[in-house]
Structures are given as structure tokens and as C-alpha cells.
Amino acid sequence: MSLATIAENYMMHNETQRAIVPYVPPPYAYANAPTLGGQAGEMESMSLGILNQAMSSTTGASGALKDEKAAFGAMAEALRDPEPIRQIKKHVGLRTLKHLKIELASMRRRYAILRVVILMSGCVTMATSMAGGLTIIDKDIYQDLNGDGWLSKTIHGLNLLCTTMLLAAGKISDKIQEEISRTKRDIAKIESYVSAASMSWSGDTSVPLKEVKYGDS
């Protein structure tokens, strides 16, 4: 057997051992995590756009514009929530909305009664104060009102009582007015959320928010 044949046979049996660097198989390629669908991404973008448009506005000094900002925030929240949570919040909001409107009507009645009390107390206080001021002008009135008679005691008692009622009713009416404003804002938020949850989208939610005018901005 020739030397060339021996070398050829040796190379055939040891071909796998000729590699300088051993072969390493590539790692297993895992599938990518699922991402949000196109419509969900558009809803998220629209939600952030609406919220940014509302928060970046310089208006909102009056109560109506504050309610409008709260409505913008509720609508952005509805667009951001998943569909099951959106429907749950919608049904709960419809039930809460009825009770809030009943509470609002009750607070408005109490506020109207307090305004009448304030008006009557103010009129009586003004009348008794004017009667006390007349004592400076007329000496006869001064003698009648500064004596120990029933007229003097009645006028001073009414003045003190109506002044106290005027101050107390004013503080209570201010608190009720704050509660009315807060309840109206809550109603606006719930109504906006329910309206946004009830909307049917055609799939194209890419709205150019630069063209949307908010308030006076």
C-alpha cells in the first residue's frame, strides 16, 4: 500500500477532528412577546392626546371650565381602560349617577332655603341697626330705646339674633355651595365616562388633536 493511500484513509476516518474551534449549535430562538393591536395602540395615543390637550390649557378659572377639564380626564380614562373594565365602570357609573343627581337636588333646595334665611336676617338686622342709629338724631327715640322698656329689649334682641343667624347661614351656605360644585364635577366626570364607553369606533381613531380647540386656547 502506498503512502498516499494510507494518508487518504487516515483523513477520511478523522475528518471530524480537524476543526480548530469546536462547533457550537445556535441558541433556541424564542418567539417575541405579543404586542398591542393597532386599534388598542391608537386608543392609547388618543387618550394621552386628549388628556394632554386638557391639562396644557391655560383656561379653567370658572367652574364650568373646571368641569370641562374633569370631563376630558374621564373621557381619556375611558379610552385607556380595557373593554371589560370599561363596561363595569359604565354600569356602576349609571347607578351612581342617579343617586348623585338626587343629592344635588337636595343640596340645591337647602341652599335656596339658606339664601332666604340670609335675606330675611339681613333685612331685620338692617332695620334694627337703623332704629338704633335714629337714637343719635332724635332725643325722644334715644330715651325710648335706651330705657328698660320692652321695645328696647326687643330691638336689641332681634339685632343680636339676626346677626348671629346671618353669619351662621352664610358659612353653611358656602359649604353647601362647595359641595354642589364638587357634586356637579363628579356628575360631569361620570357622564363623560359613560358617553365615551358607549361610543362605537369605526377603527380610525387617529384624530389630529392640534386642530381641536379647548376653551379659549
Curated annotation (Swiss-Prot):
InterPro entries: Orbi_NS3 (IPR002565). It holds the Pfam family Orbi_NS3. Belongs to the orbivirus NS3 family. May play a role in the release of virions from infected cells. This is Non-structural protein NS3. It comes from African horse sickness virus 7 (AHSV-7). The gene is Segment-10.
